[in-house]
Design a protein with these regions (language model features):
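Amide-donor transfer/coupling interface in amidating biosynthetic enzymes
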Residues: 1-137
Length: 137
């Protein structure tokens, strides 16, 4: 389902061939990712040579997985999620590159929030995405 970037197929010398840097990602309406970020488009950092094989997308969609983030040109799947799961969000980028101890990345904050809700049976104040405050939980 994940393979080497199509632009690199047949390339053996991989020096300088990564998808590297900051790229835009359009978020699907009604998706978990859109709720977490609270916006239509995000910018995230990449450092990889791999991409999602879109030939598998119909089969995965039939089994509940939703592509919820794509590059603006539609070429790359950036985020996939399982809407039926309490918190299943898979990303192609590196959210840790934009996370700080006192300002966690929205994905990390949302994951901690979902974990807290799971542990407490949903009790406690909800804090979504980047609005989580350190020490709040």
């Amino acid at each position: 389902m994940i393979y080497k970037l199509r632009d690199l197929l047949g390339v053996d010398e991989l020096g300088g061939t990564m998808r590297l840097g900051r790229y835009a990602c359009d978020l699907a309406p009604g998706s978990v990712a859109r709720r977490i970020y609270g916006q239509d488009q995000i910018w995230e950092r990449h450092r990889h040579r791999f991409e999602f094989n879109c030939l598998y997308e119909p089969t995965l969609a039939q089994n509940g997985m939703k592509v919820s983030g794509r590059s603006p040109d539609g070429k790359f799947v950036e985020i996939a999620e399982l809407p039926s799961h309490p918190w299943f969000v898979a990303v192609q980028f590196h959210p840790e590159f934009q996370s700080k101890p006192l300002k966690p990345h929205p994905l990390f904050a949302s994951f901690v929030e979902a974990s807290y809700r799971h542990k407490t049976g949903g009790r406690g104040q909800e804090a979504v995405g980047s609005r989580v405050q350190v020490g709040h939980l």
